[in-house]
């Protein structure tokens, strides 16, 4: 089994404009997703809006801490799931089932620490 992470990219303005029924429908879909894939899930959570983010940048001059997200973009990471799958095809099947009515998901394999090799 290999580890995978799904990053859930959302349009925050669409969520702000969504009605309570739309929000509850999506949260119910996430609960159903969690129940359906409980055997594979290893973690996941909804994230607070991007306005609560703090960016920490490392460069030759040192470390800079700033309020807010690192880039100006319409979509922001609204949550994530961490799970295990037998292969990429199975991981894609799980990723396609992630509820995301106001955005898209990004699937990435998780690199085991034993495979990390600094350049």
Task: Label each region the model flagged.
Residues 1-119:
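Conserved, structured core segments of small domains
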């Amino acid at each position: 089994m290999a580890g995978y992470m799904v990053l859930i990219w959302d349009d925050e303005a669409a969520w702000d404009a969504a009605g309570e029924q739309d929000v509850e429908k999506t949260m119910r879909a996430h609960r159903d997703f969690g129940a359906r894939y409980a055997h594979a899930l290893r973690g996941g959570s909804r994230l607070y809006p991007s306005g609560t983010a703090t960016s920490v940048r490392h460069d030759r001059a040192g470390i800079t801490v700033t309020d807010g997200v690192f880039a100006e973009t319409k979509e922001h990471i609204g949550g994530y799931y961490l799970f295990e799958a037998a292969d990429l095809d199975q991981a894609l099947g799980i990723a396609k089932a992630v509820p995301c009515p106001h955005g898209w998901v990004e699937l990435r394999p998780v690199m085991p620490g034993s495979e990390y090799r600094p350049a």
